[in-house]
Amino acid sequence: MIKKGSQVRILRPESYWHNEIGTVATVDQSGIRYPVIVRFDKVNYSGINTNNFAVNELVEIQTNSYKAK
């Protein structure tokens, strides 16, 4: 289960971060097409370090035991 704080690998081939590892920032439950926002250490050509992905475009590498306050 992908949740906030999880380490994920990107499977989307056209993405700048294809096969890179990022950290899940948020997971939207409202039913949108790309509900998972992933944050990366390196920036793309535009200076952006986050992107939205569908759940099926991600593979969870490590689960973080993040607990909201």
Swiss-Prot record:
SUPFAM superfamilies in UniProt: Electron transport accessory proteins
Gene3D superfamilies: 2.30.30.50
Domain of life: Eukaryota
InterPro entries: Elect_transpt_acc-like_dom_sf, PSI_PsaE
GO biological process, any: photosynthesis
One GO term describing the cellular component: chloroplast thylakoid membrane
UniProt-listed Pfam families: PSI_PsaE (PF02427)
Localization in the cell: Plastid, Chloroplast thylakoid membrane
Protein's UniProt keywords contain DNA-binding: no
Main subcellular location of this protein, as a coarse class: plastid
Keywords annotated in UniProt: Chloroplast, Membrane, Photosynthesis, Photosystem I, Plastid, Thylakoid
Protein family per UniProt: Belongs to the PsaE family.
Role this protein plays: Stabilizes the interaction between PsaC and the PSI core, assists the docking of the ferredoxin to PSI and interacts with ferredoxin-NADP oxidoreductase.
Cross-referenced HAMAP family: PSI_PsaE
Protein name: Photosystem I reaction center subunit IV
Organism: Cyanidium caldarium
